[in-house]
Swiss-Prot record:
The organism of origin for this protein: Schizosaccharomyces pombe (strain 972 / ATCC 24843) (Fission yeast)
Cellular location(s): Nucleus
CDD domains hit by this protein: RING-Ubox_PRP19
Protein name (record): Pre-mRNA-processing factor 19
GO CC terms: cytoplasm; cytosol; nuclear envelope; nucleus; post-mRNA release spliceosomal complex; Prp19 complex; spliceosomal complex; U2-type catalytic step 1 spliceosome
Cited Gene3D superfamilies: YVTN repeat-like/Quinoprotein amine dehydrogenase, Zinc/RING finger domain, C3HC4 (zinc finger)
Transmembrane segments: none
Cross-referenced InterPro entries: Apc4-like_WD40_dom, Pre-mRNA_splic_Prp19_cc, Prp19, RING-Ubox_PRP19, Ubox_domain, WD40/YVTN_repeat-like_dom_sf, WD40_repeat_CS, WD40_repeat_dom_sf
Signal peptide: none
Record's keyword terms, sorted: DNA damage, DNA repair, mRNA processing, mRNA splicing, Nucleus, Repeat, Spliceosome, Transferase, Ubl conjugation pathway, WD repeat
């Protein structure tokens, strides 16, 4: 008997009642399930129409291909070829798997190295901040002189409120700095070169050439910049190249308290103004919301990061004011030539005519330490946003001095060709732009060598002051010719 479908001897023969043909049981059942018909006659057929055939057990005959030696050799050759092909495929798969595993191991090793480096940098930063906190909290009797600190009225209440605000602000900002790692994504040689090759656009011109110009970008939107030229206070809208005179009197100093509030110092008072700025443009400033009377002319004015206090300096005194009254003043036995507040707000530094830098605790007015002296009067001071760098320039030196507050030492001098005219450190503390009046320099901090590398030197003459506009990736500078220009 042979199966009508396969033509081979069936193992389980059955006969179809419909056609009378013999089939292999598994084959005919599959056909009926799919078509419900007999495969030979195409008549309707069900599984009940299949009748099993009982036959004695027998040895199935060999197929024709295995009945002769040549046929067997051919069969063996085919089997060998199949084994060889399968072995080749297995070897190829093994090679690919090894390559994938090797790539994965290299990627894992690189990831572990990056994690290790980042962990090390994090630990170094934490250790540096801890050392810095210890340094500013330790008062050395050999280096600290007793200062005359005069408190205002209601001493206890003022001191408690000031201390609480300073400590709260310090905790918030220092912890935020530990979590946030700022990187200048645009600080590449090509990007800086493209910035410096741009044609400067004029925002303002025909200013008095004998007076200096100071810039104060808004803390949240550097498109708006306060500009103090002589005793005239303007606000510059960088995006639209427009200006607005926001104060009619003679301004001696100014600063932003918040993005919508400014402080302006005159000869007899410090006035607080609401000054909302938005994308719709500049708005006029109304009457001051509060006014603080002062006894001496204020040369420098800085806002505490909380926006609730002001730090000021006259010729020989440093002051702290709330937005309503004076909290205390410190008498310094030297002429004060510059003032800067730490980004965390827990201390401030005064640059003196004798070249010294004196650090004071904001909450109490106690002197913490002093650096220097430099060889000439301190000209400008700027803390880095990383919390531990202090950039210093002097009147007569051609070097920019970088102090490290963690180590309480001068870590680097950046030389220029002639006396430093202006300097500005960007928000990442990794880009430093400066000018000696004839050349514009851009330096970048290289962490591997812990030094500053000069990225570019561009001839831009007559620069008297400059500042980074961080969000815009632009530079704003004034010239001795009485113009204010934007680069980028």
């Amino acid at each position: 008997m042979f199966c009508s479908i396969s033509g081979e001897t069936p193992k389980e023969p059955v006969i179809s009642r419909v056609s009378g043909n013999v089939y292999e049981k598994r084959l005919i059942e599959q056909v009926i399930r799919e078509t419900s018909k007999d495969p030979v006659t195409q008549q309707e057929c069900t599984l009940e129409d299949l009748v099993p055939v009982k036959v004695p057990d027998f040895v199935r005959p060999r197929p024709p291909s295995a009945t002769s030696l040549p046929a067997l050799l051919s069969l063996f050759q085919e089997e060998w070829d199949s084994v060889a092909l399968e072995q080749f495929e297995l070897r190829r798969n093994l090679t690919e798997t090894k390559q994938e595993l090797s790539t994965a191991l290299y990627s894992l090793d690189a990831a572990l190295r990056v994690i290790s480096r980042l962990t090390k940098e994090r630990d170094e930063a934490r250790e540096a901040l801890a050392k810095f906190s210890d340094n500013i909290g330790t008062v050395s009797s050999k280096t600290i002189e007793v200062q005359e600190v005069e408190m205002g009225e209601s001493d206890d209440q003022l001191k408690t409120s000031l201390r609480s605000t300073v400590e709260k602000t310090f905790q918030e900002l220092s912890s935020k700095r530990k979590r946030t790692k700022l990187q200048p994504k645009w600080a590449t040689d090509d990007a800086v070169s493209q910035l410096l090759q741009a044609t400067p656009s004029t925002i303002l011109e025909n200013l008095e050439t004998e007076s200096t110009t100071s810039f104060f970008p808004s803390p949240e939107n550097s498109s708006f910049v306060l500009c103090l030229h002589k005793d005239e206070l303007l606000c510059l809208d960088i995006q639209s190249n427009s200006t607005l005179k926001i104060f009619e009197g003679s301004a001696l100093a100014c600063c932003w308290l918040t993005s919508s509030k400014i402080a302006v110092a005159t000869a007899d008072a410090i006035s607080i103004f609401e000054f909302p700025v938005s994308s719709s443009g500049l708005q006029s400033v109304g009457e001051p919301t509060s006014s603080i009377p002062i006894d001496e002319k204020v040369n420098f004015l800085q806002a505490h990061p909380s926006g609730e206090y002001l730090l000021a300096a006259s010729n020989e005194k440093c002051y702290i004011f709330s937005l309503k009254s004076q909290v205390y003043n410190i008498t310094v036995a030297q002429h004060i030539t510059s003032l800067a507040v730490h980004p965390d707000g827990n201390l401030f530094v005064a640059g003196l005519e004798n070249g010294e830098l004196r650090f004071f605790e904001t909450s109490s007015g106690n002197e913490l330490t002093k650096f220097g002296p430099h060889s000439s009067p301190v000209k400008t001071l700027q803390f880095g946003e990383n919390g531990y760098w202090l950039v210093v320039t002097t009147n007569d030196d051609s070097d920019i001095f970088i102090w490290d507050l963690r180590k309480s030492e001068l870590v680097q001098k950046i030389p220029l060709q002639t006396k430093v005219a202006a300097v500005s450190l960007d928000i990442t503390s990794q880009l430093l732009v400066s000018s000696d009046g004839e050349t514009l320099y851009v330096h970048i901090y290289v962490k591997s060598s812990k030094s500053w590398r000069c990225m570019s030197q561009t001839h831009v003459s007559s620069i008297s002051n400059l500042v980074w506009l961080n969000e815009l990736h632009q530079l704003l500078f004034s010239t001795s010719n009485g113009a204010i220009l934007r680069l980028g």
